[in-house]
């Protein structure tokens, strides 16, 4: 007998409120055929590769920290195109349109030769090598060694009109019922998102964690990151950003391999399960009495990675990149007339060794006690951009989206909403500065707040470095050739009459 039964599955209904749709910039931005070239000066920095060298009182930094394993976060300032002296003022109507810049291409130039720089720690928490052991040995109260290694090889850059967002693991707050019982226990972890600032450290093979908080012994990582937070760009959140301002596009190349295999010194926090937790003989069989293996060794294994070969065949820098289609809704429009370029590159990681004598006179014999060794690291950058002039119509639906995205843009365009005055009649005193009248009202002028003032960037001002002569610059010539804007000279054909030869008579 056939019976009809109702469907037992769940029925999914669409949401009742309308979902706000964010328009792509291509839907309301009109691009012109006017392109500008912008190029920075040669940007140089010199410092110590591991830490800041401070004065004796510790209040003043005498030599800054400049490492090849740091991020370089450039904040490039461009002129306001609405206040720009255009060659053709009929390009737009200021009563119905506003001008913005669009990034059409860029090139990140890097100077200095390729090189591998090592890092390390004079008291590195390395009990011993665990790859090739000849005997089973236990640890002592202090097994730290002077160890160095080369970091993971990283080449990366992120381009957007707001700072790049990074992610790292940090200590999480402890629940209230467990706050009094945390001594000797591993703290809870949480993933945090922060802005990648200039000078933040790159992950060099030990993970993107806050070493300042999570490395109590100050010996688990190298000197350059032991008191720092290693960050990694949060590509997932930037790719899913509703406006797509943080990352128009990015390029990334990372490589590493495990070169050495070590084990940490100290007690194991999470011991190998044994009979004390009802897991006897499930992970290992105990050794006989009297054997060295009777006391189980440390199981906190870790590798020191290596970036391996550094070659000019795999360079992301000193070559142009053209932006045709961004990954988000913002297709290269530079809101706020600024562009953020976040760079990480440790393929030019050579550290200079500089030696000086501590004696004033002439030195005739070598004595290491009279010689001081210094470390310095240098970096060289140059940024070049191709900027396209674009127009935005002052329509209600366009202004509504821009106001929801960033109301400061409309204020910069002098399109702020003026509130209705509460009282049309005000009191105006003559001789307001005299002693016969009341004190003048102190009206504090409200300055425009910089939303990124609390962050550290390498500021690059290009407000006076724009040019229409693209063919006068290397990146401009590449752009002209790539986009087919080059005017080819016409070939002039001339007809030349060749006199006919005289026929010879046969004899």
Curated annotation (Swiss-Prot):
Q: Where in the cell is it found?
A: Virion; Host nucleus
**What's the superkingdom here?**
Viruses
One Gene Ontology term from the biological process aspect of the record:
virion attachment to host cell
What are the entry keywords? Capsid protein, Disulfide bond, Host nucleus, Host-virus interaction, Late protein, T=7 icosahedral capsid protein, Viral attachment to host cell, Viral penetration into host cytoplasm, Virion, Virus endocytosis by host, Virus entry into host cell
Its main localization is virion
Q: Which family does it belong to?
A: Belongs to the papillomaviridae L1 protein family.
Describe its function.
Forms an icosahedral capsid with a T=7 symmetry and a 50 nm diameter. The capsid is composed of 72 pentamers linked to each other by disulfide bonds and associated with L2 proteins. Binds to heparan sulfate proteoglycans on cell surface of basal layer keratinocytes to provide initial virion attachment. This binding mediates a conformational change in the virus capsid that facilitates efficient infection. The virion enters the host cell via endocytosis. During virus trafficking, L1 protein dissociates from the viral DNA and the genomic DNA is released to the host nucleus.
Its name, as the record gives it, is: Major capsid protein L1
Organism name: Human papillomavirus 17
Its taxonomic placement starts with: Viruses, Monodnaviria, Shotokuvirae, Cossaviricota, Papovaviricetes
